[in-house]
């Protein structure tokens, strides 16, 4: 994990979900953004012979972590990467694509390359908008653009719903979203918040697995609904 508040919050939440004392010394390896590689961290992690490895890195560190795992021959039963690592562009930086086939992650967005959503009205609107305003980027293959599109869409809907365009009014509206559909969220997913009691707008997602040959992820199974449950494990909430 990255050595910052986000990384620490993830570890705290994971340990809370698994149970106190579930993560022993050496189970958690941190890195600094300026670290040239993650070989040392992965070597330390390999010494614990883990069955499950969670890579909660960002940007180029995602590929560095997976390259180090492959190079050192670490073969956990489950290898999970955070959503921010699941961009095909970042996964494409891994040298041995076959070795990362089967890597797991999660999403709440429709993959832009998935044919089952090709005729979805929201997906079509995304494709049309990106073709018009950002045709030079790889929006048909990289879900990170869909994420940006979706965040913009929910912002617009929040601003439209706010009684006044003031900070307090917009924040109050954002903290009381009533199952708002926006962007390219998966069917069945919506933005819902309930003030301080439940400030998490998205609490449904699905698992997905990486296909090294196709260089993209494939969705697995149905949505997993955590509505109202995230607060039981989350330890750091932005104000």
Question: What are these regions, as identified by a protein language model?
Answer:
Residues 132-145, 156-219:
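Segments of small-molecule ligand-sensing domains
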Residues 10, 58-61, 147-151, 203:
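Catalytic-loop motifs flanking and including active-site residues across diverse enzymes
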Residues 15-23, 43-50, 67-74, 95, ...:
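Sec-exported extracytoplasmic/periplasmic mature domains
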Residues 1-72:
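Extracellular/periplasmic Venus flytrap/periplasmic-binding protein
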Residues 222-239:
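Short, cationic low-complexity segments
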Residues 28-29, 221-223:
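Short hydrophobic alpha-helix segments
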Residues 1, 26-28, 52-57, 77-83, ...:
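Structural recognition of the beta-strand scaffold that forms the well-ordered cores
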Residues 69-149, 236-238:
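Extracellular/periplasmic periplasmic-binding protein-like sensory domains
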């Amino acid at each position: 994990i990255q050595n910052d508040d986000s990384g620490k919050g993830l570890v705290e939440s994971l340990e809370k979900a698994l149970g106190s004392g579930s993560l022993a010394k050496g189970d958690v390896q941190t890195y600094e953004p300026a670290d040239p590689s993650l070989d040392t961290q992965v070597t330390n992690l390999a010494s614990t012979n883990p069955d499950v490895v969670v890579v909660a890195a960002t940007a180029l560190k995602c590929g560095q972590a997976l390259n180090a795992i492959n190079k050192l021959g670490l073969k956990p039963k489950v290898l999970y990467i955070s959503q921010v690592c699941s961009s095909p562009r970042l996964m494409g930086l891994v040298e041995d694509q076959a070795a990362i086939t089967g890597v797991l992650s999660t999403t709440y967005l429709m993959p832009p390359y998935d044919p089952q959503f090709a005729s979805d009205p929201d997906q079509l609107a995304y494709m049309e908008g990106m073709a018009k305003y950002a045709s030079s980027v790889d929006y048909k293959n990289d879900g990170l653009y869909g994420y940006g599109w979706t965040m913009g869409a929910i912002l617009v809907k929040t601003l439209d719903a706010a009684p006044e365009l003031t900070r307090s009014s917009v924040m109050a509206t954002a903290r009381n979203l009533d199952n708002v559909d926006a962007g390219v969220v998966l069917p069945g997913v919506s933005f819902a918040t309930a003030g301080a009691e439940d400030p998490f707008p998205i609490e449904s997602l699905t698992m997905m697995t990486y296909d090294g040959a196709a260089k993209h992820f494939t969705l697995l199974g149905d949505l997993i609904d955590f509505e109202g449950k995230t607060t039981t494990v989350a330890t750091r909430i932005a104000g």
